[in-house]
């Protein structure tokens, strides 16, 4: 036998368990599934130790060797997964209906409206309090502008239990599912998406979540779906179109109650790729003001998104009472 050659195939070698590409390897199984920019924990070290660049030991599906307590940093054991065999504490965030899971690393989570169901392969965690078992779903800020804004410290998000939300640019329903968790069974999410391919996924999400009403239609023509959508408390928009402020304004005029709120995600590139992002954001804010939309807060989404900002404001604010 050659010196330095192990007959057992070198567990933990370059491609095997905990190696560089195998189980719990390079940020794949047990990492954040390539969760852009090294997953949740920032740049990460390419995921040795079962996805250190992920949520320290994985944040996506438990992968092989997961819940059995192995899986080198998978879900149940090894070096720190989402639960990692330790007690995790879930505490309420200052935004109502949103929670923080405190473990080895903190994560933003929402209370799962449909326990036992993942929507896009996100990690779930169950917390038992006496007889009551509550399941939470991890909310990845690299895949959701709202989560990025919350972790970026936005002052008000206006999406809370019991409210009605018109969500423009719903895509496959990843963020919509978390909004559905937040507003709960008393609230409603009207999810508008133009692409039929994404719309199919959105409809599948809505089948299990009774508070989501999918609308497969162009948000530029709100009159086409006015029979489906009632008055709402909040409009959220992530449409990435050059005329997106006009699109939001049209929908606000149709469906947003006076004194209601809007949350708009602006991608500078989509509006004017030649101008500086700050100039684009300022121009969009000006357009909003001309449409009876009063911006109250603006926030960039670094480090989760480049050249993105979220603008939060109020629609047709009630006139100030003169004393």
From Swiss-Prot:
Gene3D superfamilies linked: Phosphorylase Kinase, domain 1, Vaccinia Virus protein VP39
Top-level class of the enzyme under EC nomenclature: transferase
Pfam families: Fibrillarin
Any one GO CC term of the record: Cajal body
Ranges annotated as biased composition (Gly residues): 7-44, 63-78
Record EC number: 2.1.1.-
GO terms for MF: histone H2AQ104 methyltransferase activity; RNA binding; rRNA methyltransferase activity; U6 snRNA 2'-O-ribose methyltransferase activity
Region (Disordered): 1-78
PROSITE patterns linked to this entry: FIBRILLARIN
Principal location class: nucleus
Subcellular location, record wording: Nucleus, Nucleolus; Nucleus, Nucleoplasm
Entry-linked InterPro entries: Fibrillarin, Fibrillarin_CS, SAM-dependent_MTases_sf
Catalytic activity: L-glutaminyl-[histone H2A] + S-adenosyl-L-methionine = N(5)-methyl-L-glutaminyl-[histone H2A] + S-adenosyl-L-homocysteine + H(+); a ribonucleotide in rRNA + S-adenosyl-L-methionine = a 2'-O-methylribonucleotide in rRNA + S-adenosyl-L-homocysteine + H(+); a ribonucleotide in U6 snRNA + S-adenosyl-L-methionine = a 2'-O-methylribonucleotide in U6 snRNA + S-adenosyl-L-homocysteine + H(+)
Keyword list, A-Z: Methylation, Methyltransferase, Nucleus, Ribonucleoprotein, RNA-binding, rRNA processing, S-adenosyl-L-methionine, Transferase
Post-translational modification note: By homology to other fibrillarins, some or all of the N-terminal domain arginines are modified to asymmetric dimethylarginine (DMA).
Binding of S-adenosyl-L-methionine, residues: 174-175, 193-194, 218-219, 238-241
Coiled-coil regions listed in the entry: none
Residues covered by region (Helical): 276-308
Biological processes, Gene Ontology terms: box C/D sno(s)RNA 3'-end processing; ribosomal small subunit biogenesis; rRNA methylation
Keyword Transferase among UniProt keywords: yes
Complexes and interactors: Component of box C/D small nucleolar ribonucleoprotein (snoRNP) particles. Part of the small subunit (SSU) processome, composed of more than 70 proteins and the RNA chaperone small nucleolar RNA (snoRNA) U3.
Family per record: Belongs to the methyltransferase superfamily. Fibrillarin family.
Function: S-adenosyl-L-methionine-dependent methyltransferase that has the ability to methylate both RNAs and proteins. Involved in pre-rRNA processing by catalyzing the site-specific 2'-hydroxyl methylation of ribose moieties in pre-ribosomal RNA. Probably catalyzes 2'-O-methylation of U6 snRNAs in box C/D RNP complexes. U6 snRNA 2'-O-methylation is required for mRNA splicing fidelity. Also acts as a protein methyltransferase by mediating methylation of 'Gln-105' of histone H2A (H2AQ104me), a modification that impairs binding of the FACT complex and is specifically present at 35S ribosomal DNA locus.
Name the UniProt record assigns to this protein: rRNA 2'-O-methyltransferase fibrillarin
Organism per entry: Xenopus laevis (African clawed frog)
Gene: fbl
